Amino acid sequence: MKNIHSIEFYTGSKEELLPGFEKDFPYIASRAELDKYIGHYVPWHWHKTVELFYMESGSIEYDTPGGKILFPAGSGGMINPNVLHMTKAISQREKNIQLLHIFDVSLLAGEQGSRIEQKYIAPVITAPQIEVIPLFPGNAEEERILKLLAASFRLSSDEFGYEIKLREALTEIWLMLFELSCSMREKKGEHNKSNDKIKLMMIYIHEHYREKISIPELAAAAY
């Protein structure tokens, strides 16, 4: 697991560049030390991968177009692919450290169009109303997922069968998230997560909301 203190973007975009992300095993594990980021925050960005995270210590705030959620130590969650988000370190008493699994859904689903993708993956990642699936201690079902999530970060890449064990752990977690998200999937969503130009305009609005924004300025942010 790599310690990270900054974020990289694709040129001319706010899509996150993921160093070390390979097609033959589309997954990376990160330990984000938020206090070492410039300004103690990760700016607005998105990625085409799933973000599954667990708060090792401290607390962070996630911002998405749908609102803000505070995640203290011991909590966690899932950020859907293509969802615009930013994070801020909140705790001033302890280190704000976040553990992350970043992976392409093909790691779990296999070939595109597979039965697994159609039944268990697509219903979640194509639901525009699902930006975040938050997990907090105190809720029995969510606590079960959090325990599995915390344990999954203890797998060592040096041990025999690591890739298979990791995929097995992530698959079990995903299936539980699928069940947990049932009520969320039943709600109707309106916005399009995959439109990059809309994302760029939303970032501009979030960063300049105190100013008077003109239509030409907003258009220039995306074109």
Regions of interest found by a model, annotated:
Residues 1-76, 82-83, 118, 129:
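Generic protein-terminus/edge-of-domain signal
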Residues 40-46, 88-90, 110-113, 162-164:
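Short histidine-centered beta-strand/loop micro-motifs
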Residues 51-54, 117, 141-148, 169, ...:
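Amphipathic, well-ordered alpha-helical segments in soluble domains
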Residues 61, 86, 208:
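Detector for the N-terminal beta1/A-loop initiation region of ABC nucleotide-binding domains
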Residues 82-108, 113-116:
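Ligand-binding loop in jelly-roll beta-barrel domains
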Residues 115-146:
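Aromatic/histidine-rich interaction motifs
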Residues 131-142, 155-217, 221:
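Short, Lys/Arg-enriched, Trp-marked, Pro/Gly-tolerant hinge/linker segments that flank
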